[in-house]
Amino acid sequence: MNDLVVAYKPAIYNLIEEKSREIGFTMPSDLYVGSLLKTLISSKPKSNILELGTGIGLLLSWMIDGMDSESKLITIDNDPTLISIAQDFFGNDHRVSIVCEDGTKWLRTYKGNKFDLVFADAWPGKYSEIDKVLELIKIGGFYVVDDMSAQENWPDEHQKNVDQLIGYLEGREDIFLTKMNWSTGLVIAVKK
């Protein structure tokens, strides 16, 4: 097996990657994480999905690719420039709601349906508001976090945040947890 070759990238992926280079976006997403998210989402027909941290939309393209016609996805970022780009790429997809708002504020005020999958790629939902996020996940739903392995661009002392998050999740009794030393370092939890 050669997992270095990722087949079946979303049709729009290369255009988003090109836009990423054009604007100098320095936090591109990993193909492996995208492929995994697509696979997990494909297992949840008629799903309700939340992405915290839209970025430029690279992983969003994978997530949308895995959705069926009756699934819904909300993606949130607080950067209006990135949200505008995501809107250009995905704004016509009736299944997708693209929200420009602080993730903490959004999580604290959200009153809608629970989620089948939450992908946390931003501070809110990953290092803050964790209890709220886990409350919003259906039984059998996934909580996915990436960037858990040390990276060159991490600020000093960031490893402490990662260690605290993992320790906290390991101590919870309402989730099954798998830590994966793969790609950017992943944590996948399933709500009991």
Where are these regions (language model features)?
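A short alpha-helical cap/connector motif
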Residues: 1-117, 124-144, 148-192
